[in-house]
Regions:
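Structural recognition of the beta-strand scaffold that forms the well-ordered cores
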Residues: 31, 77-82, 118-123, 174-177, ...
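Histidine-centered active-site loop/cap adjacent to the catalytic His
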Residues: 196-238
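Sec-exported extracytoplasmic/periplasmic mature domains
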Residues: 84, 108-115, 161, 165, ...
């Protein structure tokens, strides 16, 4: 499913129960529902961008040591991972087994390569609270339930916190809450619209469900920065 359009870049998300690594591309994208871009998009040619800088094709797996060697790093001391909104399409969801499988795999691989590395899991921010859900996904189907989607975000963050605090990972992993440090009301894309056809009063209406404005991304960056400062000051203590 085509999720968002940027200059010279299209971003896709997988549909329900679709875990294929790359989408099949035809010669045209036709608008079906949601979003603010309704025109057909003609595809002349395309290529896929490598999404994982740590992937080693030779071994078909993440390879952190080869990555460090390539860029002249002696090793890894601190790791900050934002486990994103991708795949959080079920309202009121409490089952994140598919996500935790890969989260555990990632953290274990890092720990095996660099046993002294300290990992910080960053939770996800709350989605748009003033219309962005409807702008992107309409009034039916996945993501359309705003309160249900917000509940899923809370439940997912709780899952990540419990994972970080579990016996398996608590010695080298911690959880940092992003949603408490993110302004979902004012740092999401929005436009001014009349409150109704008989009034000149305007209000801000969201135009994107889960992708922040630049200021919003910078605010998520602030969450990382605070975590980094704490690690430096406290010497990586949880």
């Amino acid at each position: 499913i085509l999720e968002s359009i940027e200059e010279k870049r299209l971003k896709f998300k997988r549909g329900n129960l679709n875990y294929t690594p790359t989408p099949k591309i035809g010669d045209k994208f036709i608008h079906v529902s949601g979003g603010i871009h309704h025109e057909d998009i003609i595809v002349n040619k395309y290529e896929f961008e490598m999404g994982n800088p740590f992937w080693n094709k030779a071994i078909e797996n993440n390879d952190f040591k080869t990555y460090c060697s390539k860029y002249g790093y002696e090793g890894i001391d601190l790791v900050y991972v934002l486990l994103s909104w991708n795949g959080q399409y079920i309202p009121y969801n409490t089952n994140f087994d598919h996500h935790t499988i890969y989260a555990k795999k990632l953290m274990t691989q890092i720990h095996e390569a660099y046993p002294n590395a300290h990992i910080t899991l960053l939770g996800i921010q709350i989605c748009s609270v003033n219309g962005g859900i409807g702008a992107n996904y309409g009034a039916s189907g996945y993501y359309s339930d705003e309160f249900g989607t917000i509940t899923t975000a809370f439940n997912y963050n709780k899952c990540l916190e419990e994972l970080a605090n579990s016996d398996e990972f608590k010695d080298y992993v911690r959880y940092v809450d992003t949603k408490a440090q993110f302004d979902s009301e004012y740092n999401m894309p929005m436009i001014l619209k009349k409150v109704n056809t008989r009034s000149t009063i305007t209000e801000y209406i969201g135009t994107n469900a889960v992708h922040p404005t630049l200021n919003g991304y910078l605010q998520i960056g602030d969450v990382f920065y605070r975590a980094l400062v704490r690690d430096i000051v406290d010497g990586n203590k949880k």
